[in-house]
């Protein structure tokens, strides 16, 4: 570091001093408007987030209903196929395979229902 000269210490920088009204209009007013816009933007975003989450949950609920409907239709189709082929006959490997598939689909649907319930519970907390 170099030592300061006495001349440098004696001459302070000149700073333009504004009237309070000019200062307010030039510097504070734009900042206040910008802050208001930011607050309004954050408020709008905060309002949209729950709506988006509700939309996602509604979409997931519809998917679960479709899956459940498909599982029930598959089970019914498998049962109708077995009854049409003669329910008194011993069950063949195709019937057992159809039952296994129906059970797997039912398990998947139940797991999806549990997942949605956990998501709903975590979002409501």
Swiss-Prot record:
Query: Cross-referenced Pfam families, in alphabetical order?
Result: MRFAP1 (PF15155)
Recorded GO CC terms: nucleus; perinuclear region of cytoplasm
Q: Which family does it belong to?
A: Belongs to the MORF4 family-associated protein family.
Q: Where does it primarily localize?
A: nucleus
> What keywords tag this UniProt record?
Coiled coil, Cytoplasm, Nucleus
Q: Found in which tissues? A: Widely expressed in all tissues examined and as early as 7 days during embryonic development.
Q: Where is this region: Disordered?
A: 76-99
Q: Provide the protein's localization.
A: Nucleus; Cytoplasm, Perinuclear region
Supply the name of the protein: MORF4 family-associated protein 1
Ranges in a coiled coil:
94-124
């Amino acid at each position: 570091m170099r030592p300061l000269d006495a001349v440098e210490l004696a001459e302070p920088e000149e700073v333009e001093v504004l009237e309070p009204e000019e200062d307010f209009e030039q510097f504070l007013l734009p900042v206040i408007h910008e802050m208001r816009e930011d607050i309004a933007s954050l408020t709008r975003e905060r309002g949209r987030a729950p709506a988006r989450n509700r939309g996602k949950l509604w979409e997931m609920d519809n998917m679960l209903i479709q899956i459940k409907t498909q599982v029930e239709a598959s089970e019914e189709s498998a049962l109708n196929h077995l009854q049409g082929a003669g329910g008194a006959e011993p069950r063949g490997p195709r019937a057992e395979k159809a039952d296994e598939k129906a059970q797997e689909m039912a398990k998947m649907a139940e797991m999806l229902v549990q997942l949605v319930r956990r998501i709903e519970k975590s979002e409501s907390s």
